[in-house]
Amino acid sequence: MAEIGIDQSKLPGVKEVCRDFAVLEDHTLAHNLQEQEIEHHLATNIQRNRLVQHDLQVAKQLQEEEDLKARAQIQKRQKDLERQDSEIAQEIQVKLVFEAEQRRRQEEKDEDIARLLQQKELQEEKKRKKHYPESQEHKVYEDSYYSENGGTKLRGTKQTVYDKPRREQELSDAEIARKLQEEELLANQADQMAAQVAQDEEIARLLMAEEKKAFKKGKEKEKSSFERKRNDQDWKHDASESPRSRSKEGPETQRHKGDKSSRSQPLLDDFEHARYYTSQPSPLRQFSKPEHSPKGSRRKQ
């Protein structure tokens, strides 16, 4: 077998071989470091995405729980208002029935008084009729005069003259009592109507205030939910853009590997960039649980 001859004059020097070996070693080391950095960055992105998904699920669950609690509180307040309105209506109904019963009893009492007065008046009139003929027996001249000139008519005229002012007074008193009673009833009805109107206005004002609070709270919840969704979308967009930028920077760093100093500086920059991404906390980790809506107890005043 023929030996292959080696031209010693064409062999490179020891320094050149060492320099080429150092360049190759640096290139291999830089490639390994870049691969490790890319793998670490991808693993960090995967972990961050999982954490974001978990935070979104937790936030959605908490929001649903808050919505259920708010709806339950609104329904409870509505039921309380309905119950109070029914109680107030029942009390007003009982009061009206009681007042109607009082008016009926007063009317019956007035009728009894009028009947007693009429009976008393009839009895007094009968007594006067019985007493008047006895007094005439002692006056023969007057009796003969009355019998000859229509004394019965004159006696009836005198009795009418005596009874007329008394009847007029009784009728006037009865009319005054009736008017006073009517005025009292009208005043009571006016007071009841004014109280009912004031109560209805207060109930309407409270209901309007409750509706305004519920509407304002719903708007705030919608606004906060929209802000969270927008922040989540912006964060996802930034997270999706970072691997692309890193993949574009890889060939450029490989293309500029002239010497050891020029290769080590981009690696340090990329390492600091990766540390910055891993040190940034997730936006949704700072998610604060919304406060519970205040319990509606203002209606119970």
Swiss-Prot record:
Domain of life of the source: Eukaryota
Keyword tags: Coiled coil, Phosphoprotein
Keyword Lipoprotein in record: no
GO-annotated cellular components: cytoplasm
Region annotation Disordered: where it falls in the sequence: 123-175, 214-301
InterPro entries noted in UniProt: CCDC50, CCDC50_N
Any one Gene Ontology molecular-function term assigned to this protein's record: ubiquitin protein ligase binding
Post-translational modification: Phosphorylated on tyrosine residues.
Residue ranges with Basic and acidic residues bias: 123-142, 161-175, 214-262
Coiled coil: 57-131
Pfam hit, one: CCDC50_N
Entry function: Involved in EGFR signaling.
Protein name from the UniProt record: Coiled-coil domain-containing protein 50
The gene coding this protein: CCDC50
